[in-house]
Amino acid sequence: MTDYSKTVNLLESPFPMRGNLAKREPAWLKSWYEQKRYQKLREIAKGRPKFILHDGPPYANGDIHIGHAVNKILKDIIIRSKTQAGFDAPYVPGWDCHGLPIEVMVEKLHGKDMPKARFRELCREYAAEQIARQKKDFIRLGVLGDWDHPYLTMDFKTEADTVRMLGEIYKSGYLYRGAKPVQFCLDCGSSLAEAEVEYKDKISPAIDVAYLFKDTAALAAAFGLAGFEGKAFAVIWTTTPWTLPASQAVSAGADVVYQLIDTPKGKLVLAKDLAEDALKRYGFSDGIAILAETTGDKLENLHMNHPFLERDIPMLNGEHVTTDAGTGLVHTAPAHGLEDYAVCNKYGIELYNPVNAEGRYIGETPRVAGMRVWEANPVILQWLEETGNLLASSKIEHSYAHCWRHKTPLIYRATGQWFVGMDKAGADGKTLRDKAIKAVDDTEFFPSWGRARLEAMIEGRPDWVVSRQRYWGTPMTFFVHKETGELHPNSAELLEKVALKIEEKGIEAWFSLDKSELLSAEDCENYDKLSDTMDVWFDSGSTHYSVVKQREELEWPADLYLEGSDQHRGWFQSSMLTGCASSMGRAPYKQLLTHGFVVDGEGKKMSKSIGNVVAPQEVYNEFGADILRLWAASTDYSGELAISKEILKRVTESYRRIRNTLSFLFANLSDFNPIEDAVQQADMVEIDRYAVVLARQLQECLAGDYYPRYAFHFAVKDIVSFCSEDLGAFYLDILKDRLYTTKADSHARRSAQTALYHITRSLVLLIAPILCFTGEEAWDIIGGGEEDSVLFHTWHEFPTINEKTEAELVKKWTAIREAREAVTAAIEPLRADKTVGSSLQAEAEITAPEEMAGYLNALGEELRFALLVSKAEVKVGSELAVAAKASDGEKCERCWHYTRDVGAVAGYETVCKRCAENVGGEGETRHYA
């Protein structure tokens, strides 16, 4: 008896169904590094149009977390997809190396008692160690880049160019020195940039305080009264009692309506809109009378006594005054608030700051001298009670600024700092704020809501405090006049001389510099070296100049910056400001892409204390980096990205669908040589031509739309859908009969293999930006061997087909697919009650509208192959309907179809006539399916 299993084309796949990614990925990485894949790619891509994604530098401290992984994976997908789209897309990874967190770690490890030069040396060593750890993890994720030559903000050349960027801004006229209130962290002992501030809820005392008017006659006149008897008070409301020792004025809104109200306390001035609530707080319900009303502009320049100090307090008009809460009058301490500073500055009131850098009151402040500000609140409340000026006291929970490092509340504190002015006219007569808002207009945003967010932040941001009183940072390399505080008139030239020294020896060249090396003897007498360092956001915000503009393989401006949504107030903004404030005069990027934060499966923020942290190292060690990459790509990054073991298991199912599809494709291509065996497009079996069109449409969608607009979750969805629906549930299901049962080198089979070759090659190229390991594994089989890379090739070139012919082909086969779905649905009850096993055991009678019936009948005897039944008949009717029944034919041992001609050919007693022809004759011919 013949064993017909040996006559079918069941081939082994060179692409295993099990990826075993966690184990195999490290070996692939080693091989690619040894082959110098990145360097070869740069050679291959020479002369192509450039695409520059500039890497926002992660901070060189601690292991990478899942947010870092998302960020680097998204960047890598873009770099790879742009490369395959025909661009030269070099990727230079970078690290942010200066700043307080590293200082804190070095102090913990080595203590504080050492020369500053040694301290900076240890900071540099610590940063280098952290970079080595993080680099290893980024490479493990499959991120392709120039890892042997990353940029570091602590590289001597980068430090020098950061100094040069400072010089650019100085020459543009935006840099100035001023004593202004800035966000100040008492634990850092330093001012903070906006990006270093986070807001959390805090419980604070909320108090109403009375300021006694000195001249009641003047107050009466302001309210249009001839006079009145008794005392009168302006009442303020504040949540920062500790600022009252610095109170220098009270501000009223010029257009706000105020009432003079007679109360048991005396006459009180309160905003009309807030008076009722305020009086309730004071417990005044009886003996109240509204005497008169006036507007805030009439109260201007009246004078009061400070509630517990001997100090004159003028009434000012301030635009910052609102009637949202409180009393409508605002106690004004220019040392502790930007708006307070602005209004006092307008009135020429000299700033008084009673709080030192440790957050303690200086010696001349009674009762609270030497205390830290937070300790002073209860003392000040007691003081107010003693003077009779505390009208109400309660607790309030409100959003308050905290240090992002220490998680402790910040204070506003006036200090002498260097600023980049937002509203100061530069050398070209334009303000930096106007330039930056114009730059926002010129930038493309992904997602689009990023534009409004960044614009609002630029419109509302204060001047940028760029100086820091720290040790491990790029120095502000200026010489300052000892008496006037003015910069040396030759600052631009001196700065360049210092930059050249820093290029050779790093920032230590400035800290160890003897003034006499650059200044005359007279200037040495009159000028001091500035000891301040620069805000680390200035370092990273200058990398478009220190890296993108300097490195030969890059081009300025960058095409894309891609970071988390917090970078609208961080790197996106600092980069824009340095770009606009320098001679470049524009944003250093054309596009901004923002991704959300990673949360757990329930949408909760990750926290070690909760125990819901998912570490990227755990994911790639268990599942493989390709699964992590597929998760990142399949999630809509414009919002929060949820991750958990359950979510990763679902992602693994999608991966398995893609992998199993590739395994099947490669098995059926293992005896196919595209040069010798390919069938011309016009000669292919019709369904093969249709399948190639579907593959080409998928490629056009991904390569022409989803990848260029960074819509990776749509790309993944369509790839999985193509594998499971277009291929798995339709084309490959139909194709198995022809692949397995026709002659190995027949036209029917070679046509199918030609289609599979185009589909496979395109599919591998399409998945490769996302599944970089799997893509390369597959390319080893279908590409040019182990030394070849999928990245060395652009998108697949499909055979051309006439547009009209294609449209007709798609229309026809869309109708056939609809009929096939109806047939499958009609057979399902027969399978459920075990009347039939597979659909091949069934016959179908189809009633279809005329056009569909025409398409079905055009397939003739091959219709049964397209419908996966043993027999099919079609008749015309008004709507689609299918009647299915079990076939009365006999099962062919070879093809498993049920026919009435099994054993019809002598010597082939257990197989059908078609199989007998395919085994012993010339083989069958197919035209349609």
UniProtKB/Swiss-Prot annotation:
GO terms for molecular function: aminoacyl-tRNA deacylase activity; ATP binding; isoleucine-tRNA ligase activity; tRNA binding; zinc ion binding. Catalyzes the attachment of isoleucine to tRNA(Ile). As IleRS can inadvertently accommodate and process structurally similar amino acids such as valine, to avoid such errors it has two additional distinct tRNA(Ile)-dependent editing activities. One activity is designated as 'pretransfer' editing and involves the hydrolysis of activated Val-AMP. The other activity is designated 'posttransfer' editing and involves deacylation of mischarged Val-tRNA(Ile). It catalyses: tRNA(Ile) + L-isoleucine + ATP = L-isoleucyl-tRNA(Ile) + AMP + diphosphate. Its cofactor is Zn(2+). PANTHER family: ISOLEUCINE--TRNA LIGASE, MITOCHONDRIAL (PTHR42765:SF1), SOLEUCYL-TRNA SYNTHETASE (PTHR42765). Monomer. ATP binds at residue 608. One of its GO terms (cellular component) is cytosol. Its EC number is 6.1.1.5. IleRS has two distinct active sites: one for aminoacylation and one for editing. The misactivated valine is translocated from the active site to the editing site, which sterically excludes the correctly activated isoleucine. The single editing site contains two valyl binding pockets, one specific for each substrate (Val-AMP or Val-tRNA(Ile)). The gene is ileS. Keywords: Aminoacyl-tRNA synthetase, ATP-binding, Cytoplasm, Ligase, Metal-binding, Nucleotide-binding, Protein biosynthesis, Zinc. Belongs to the class-I aminoacyl-tRNA synthetase family. IleS type 1 subfamily. Binds 1 zinc ion per subunit. A motif ('KMSKS' region) lies at residues 605-609. The keyword Ribosomal protein does not apply. GO terms for biological process: isoleucyl-tRNA aminoacylation. NCBIfam families: ileS. Transmembrane segments: none annotated. InterPro entries: aa-tRNA-synth_I_CS (IPR001412), aa-tRNA-synth_Ia (IPR002300), Anticodon_Ile_BEm (IPR033708), Ile-tRNA-ligase (IPR002301), Ile-tRNA-ligase_type1 (IPR023585), Ile-tRNA_ligase (IPR050081), M/V/L/I-tRNA-synth_anticd-bd (IPR013155), Rossmann-like_a/b/a_fold (IPR014729). It is an enzyme of class 6 (ligase). L-isoleucyl-5'-AMP binds at residue 563. It comes from Neisseria meningitidis serogroup B (strain ATCC BAA-335 / MC58). This is Isoleucine--tRNA ligase. It is found in: Cytoplasm. Its main location: cytoplasm.
